[in-house]
Amino acid sequence: MLLYDSPVSGNCYKVRLLLAHLGIPYERQTVDVIDRSNRRELLGKLNPGLRVPTLVLDDGRSLGESGAILWYFGDGTRFVPEDRYLRAQVLQWMFFEQYDLEPAIAVVRFWVAYSGRPEAFEPERPAKMKAGERVLRTLDEHLDGRDYVVGDSLTLADIALYGYTHVAGEGGFSLGPHAAVRAWLDRVASEPGHVPIDA
């Protein structure tokens, strides 16, 4: 099994984190997230979105999009509840991560820490920062009094949200005001089988 991957991508990290928890071996091929000139040649037949992560299964079939890959491996494991309502809640928070958190926190982090030209994005940054702060407040309010995002144990919702939340500081977001988020990040990082983003 081959994962087309970027070591700095939170979306790729989510997949690596779940595979580590499940003990599933795989090979990695690093894809440059700055220079995209060879994306069509590299991923065109595998992922119409030309994005990482892209996973090629042992039988040659491919999957793109972090959420789809997480669900493929997570469904039927302890990371997806059996209860229908809780399963839907896991999906709700995975969608929240992709529609709200990722477009704000991940984008600013990329601009600031990895683009090599953060000044080019300065006009757009305040609006993205405001959106990211709103996301962090929402997550903090939800986690207040809870150990995990859904239910009483680690699920795909936690893995999906952890990917970019734990590196939000690289984009200039402060987790200081968000005690519940900080406690949850520590809890997720202390789970058996956890691996850091740079592993």
Model regions and ranges:
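GST-like fold's C-terminal all-alpha helical module
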Residues: 85, 97-193, 197
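GST-like domain detector, emphasizing the conserved glutathione-binding G-site
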Residues: 1-8, 13-126, 140
